[in-house]
From Swiss-Prot:
UniProt subunit comment: Homodimer.
Reactions it catalyzes: AMP + diphosphate = 5-phospho-alpha-D-ribose 1-diphosphate + adenine
Gene Ontology cellular component annotations, sorted alphabetically: cytoplasm
Tree of life domain: Bacteria
EC number in record: 2.4.2.7
GO biological process, one term: purine ribonucleoside salvage
Entries under PROSITE patterns matching the protein: PUR_PYR_PR_TRANSFER
Keyword terms: Cytoplasm, Glycosyltransferase, Purine salvage, Transferase
Subcellular location: Cytoplasm
The protein's name in its UniProt record: Adenine phosphoribosyltransferase
Amino acid sequence: MTPEFANDLKASVRAIPDYPKPGIIFRDITTLLGEPRAFRRAIDELVQPWAGSKIDKVAGIEARGFIIGGAIAHQVSSGFVPIRKKGKLPHTCVSMEYALEYGTDKIEVHVDAITPGERVILVDDLIATGGTAEGAIKLLRQIGAEVVAACFVIDLPELGGAAKIRAMGVPVRTLVAFEGH
């Protein structure tokens, strides 16, 4: 990825101060999604390391991970698996509790979403502390997935999420980093 593209990509992400609470700068990718060239280039860059590889499924974390994950699944000719918050999927599910900054939450996936041994890329818009992604990887592994990578448009490196995922033995692909949180 060229430095020019990285700068263009960063510029296409809206910063919303003090959301969802004071002191937080929310990185809003809806502006990137609304720019066809930026969206296409972001997907192409996220997919690039796995072009030509056998990827069976792309798993996207609710909600922006669905948008990015669907586009990536299309690019690599794979299926798509939604990972949702508890109670949102209609069929029999497997769930995983994961740590939040203050407390815990649960995510779920359909019990039959993955055939054991399938190669899966996990996708979301942003990685911060890595709690949700860590829970998603554990959940996918619980149902037999081989998680071959985790892809995020944005990394907040000060919060350590990407390092946490790498420590789980999963390669991480991010496109841009923003300081702070």
